[in-house]
Amino acid sequence: MTFFDYTHGAVLLIGFGLLMGCDQQLTAEQEPQKQQLINDSHQNMVSIPGGRFQMGDFGDLVELKIPYSTDPSTKPLHWVSLHDFKMSKYRVTWGEFNRWLALQGREALELYTKRKNSKISNWDELGDNYPAQVSWQDAKTYCQWLGEHSGKKTDLPTEAQWEYAARSGGQFLIYGNSDNQMHYPEDPTRNFISWWKPAGSFAPNPIGLYDMMGNGVDWMNDWYGADYYQYSPEDNPQGPENGTKKVVRGYLGSFDATLTITRGKDAPDTEFGAGFRCVENP
């Protein structure tokens, strides 16, 4: 695995259209569970005023005046304008995701069940309050389901929305944690984690979002294009029209790959692919 190609071995080869499920006939017990999931999800949204910012590697504009990254896909620095939106302060947890699966009449993911029942390890990271790791399509369907049942335009974030939010409104912040500082594992003031912890275990970034630097990665709505920044439109960019992998953002495998500008990618049908959070668009 490289820092920028966040790929796992297990792949679920299911057509995207088959995953666009709808609610089964819900029981009297499930109806309030459904409404609770929807209400909690939207109550956890953080309002983010839109604005204009410079997206990409801004290292030449600050401090040492040198690029932060050697990855050419983070360049050129380019202007982006975004409308107001809301973003979930937490990644969706296994507890939330598995409740959603049950509402669809679906079983827990096969690999999740195998690991959960394993006698080799306790797999703490599969606990209900830990970030879920799912395929891109399941993540997108989950977010759109929230929108369909709440009358709101809910989806996965675009890559531009995510970077703008991680940088707390597009500021020149290279780390998405609470103080824009790198803290090594032995540092008692460390405020992010490279491995799994319950969602929201560390302080949020300045606008109130948790785990934008560590504790996994987030799926983006966008297809990945290594040269996309060369032709990205300024207004609310949505990514390339097509591709083979989807963008992921967050902790990508090393301290050098925790930057708010770092771009990763993963196959959208990877079953245990990435974490995710939803956005609400106007």
Give short role names for the model-derived ranges.
Residues 2-10:
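Bacterial N-terminal signal peptides that target proteins for export
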Residues 4-5, 17, 256, 277:
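Compositionally biased, low-structure terminal segments
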Residues 10-18:
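Bacterial N-terminal signal peptides
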Residues 11, 36-38, 180-182:
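Intrinsic structural disorder/low-complexity segments
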Residues 19-160, 251, 263-282:
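Extended beta-strand/loop cores of jelly-roll/beta-sandwich
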Residues 54, 58-59, 64, 118-272:
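Functional-site microenvironments in short loops/helix caps that host divalent-cation chemistry
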